[in-house]
Amino acid sequence: MEKKKLSLTFRMLRLLGLNYSEEEYGQVSLWNVIKRVVKTYRDGFLLKYMMNSWLLSPISPRKLRPWVLRKIGCKVGKDVFIGDSVKVDSGHADLIYIGDHAHITGGCRLLCHQRDLSNYYVGDDAAKLPYRLGEIHIGKGCMIGMESMIMPGVTIGEGAIVGAFSLVTKDIPAWTIATGRPAKVVKQIPQRDNQES
């Protein structure tokens, strides 16, 4: 197999000690690096000063925080609640999908990348491992409890509830309650009996 020639920009980034994967950045141009840096700073500003600003606290978080997430690239449905101090993977915000009427409560983390440990062996440098990316899908009407962390590649089904301080590493089925580190389903949400009034 013929190996692609790496761009001059990528080789310079490597010389500076920046560890980017060859697959994603091997052919990157200087212009793309500049655009990405500008976007990173813009997104950081939006997240820092608009998501949790006391100056903007009189503005409804129901409107402002979902708007900020949309601006940085997340796909956010209607009537979504985003709590205080929610952190998203701003470098990969385009991999985050939040359904209508979802609630992501205070302090939650949505992480779309992590180190790929599949080829990690004794003596290897963990900092040089490539990243594995994965989409996060939060279904319609879900509630994510405070300080929970959602890992890459996870789908949380419609109407599911994730308990506070949970670490979600695998998919959560629709209409279930999951909690723990790692999160496990502890209850199936029952159907409403039509004869009850």
Where in the sequence are the language-model features?
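Terminal amphipathic alpha-helical/low-complexity segments used for targeting or macromolecular assembly
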Residues: 1-72, 114-118, 141, 181-197
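Sequence/structural signature of small/polar-enriched beta-strand/turn repeats
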Residues: 54, 72, 76, 96, ...
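Conserved short histidine dyad/triad with adjacent acidic residue
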Residues: 59, 81-82
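Flexible, glycine/small-residue-enriched loop-and-beta-strand segment within the central core
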Residues: 65-67, 84-155, 181-182, 187-196
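Short acidic capping loops at alpha-helix termini that bridge into adjacent secondary structure
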Residues: 78-79, 100, 140, 158-159, ...
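Glycine-centered loop/turn positions within well-structured domains
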Residues: 94, 166, 174-176, 184
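Short-chain dehydrogenase/reductase
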Residues: 143, 161, 177-179
